[in-house]
Amino acid sequence: MNAPNIKRTLATDAYKIIKEKIIFCEYSPGQVLNLRALTQEIGFKSFTPVREALVSLRDEDLVKIVPRQGMFVSELSLNDVTDNYQIREIIEPTTLGITCPLITKETIRYYREKFEEIRKTEDSINYLEYLKLDMNFHMDLIRPLNNNNLGSILKNIYEQNTRYRMACFKKRLPEVMILEHIEILDTIEEKDSQRASIVLKKHIINSRNALISQKLGLN
């Protein structure tokens, strides 16, 4: 579901702050969201914008509102993980087959430098920063298509999946993930659309399997 189309207000600010804390697991799945505490933490004087933000996040399945019980961070579901990766496996390789010749040398160079840097400093990597880079990378692979609807769908999926990845890999980033990104860049640089699609599909499948294999109580 698309992010709410609302004006730049306190509710917008609260929405962005709380959403990032949920996505990057600062607020844990199942955690109670106390309206008063959230309002104080964000530094607002009124409950109203925070309440509006939580309703918007409920519409994105990030917050659960239970009458007479309260508000909670939505739980992680293994079915949601597999469903999201299935969508990615269907859409992303096909899209890259179209956009591959359109991805600029500057984009390739930028991400190659970033992933090579991560590869060299893997033990001290800031995993939160890596996930933001990874999300931007996959969004930039589809960006040349100039399809805003597709971009919104995939962005929502990336944000949902980031929660699972934070839960699974925040202690250590599997090296194979970095190597697969570099392999994707190699095929794009060669303008080999068919090979790029195959490599990306393999990467998505491997990422899904790695998440499931962690068995961190996501079901």
Segments predicted by a language model, with ranges:
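Short linear motifs at protein or domain termini
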Residues: 1-101, 213-219
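Short helix-capping and inter-helix turn/linker motifs at the boundaries of alpha-helical repeat units
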Residues: 9, 109, 172-176
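Hydrophobic alpha-helical segments typical of transmembrane helices
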Residues: 18, 49, 80, 91, ...
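Short loop-to-helix capping motifs
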Residues: 35, 147-148, 191-192
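Conserved amphipathic alpha-helical segments that form helical-bundle/coiled-coil interaction surfaces
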Residues: 84, 96, 101-166, 177-186, ...
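Short, charge-rich amphipathic alpha-helical segments embedded
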Residues: 152, 204-219
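Short amphipathic alpha-helical interaction/hinge segments
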Residues: 162-172, 208-215
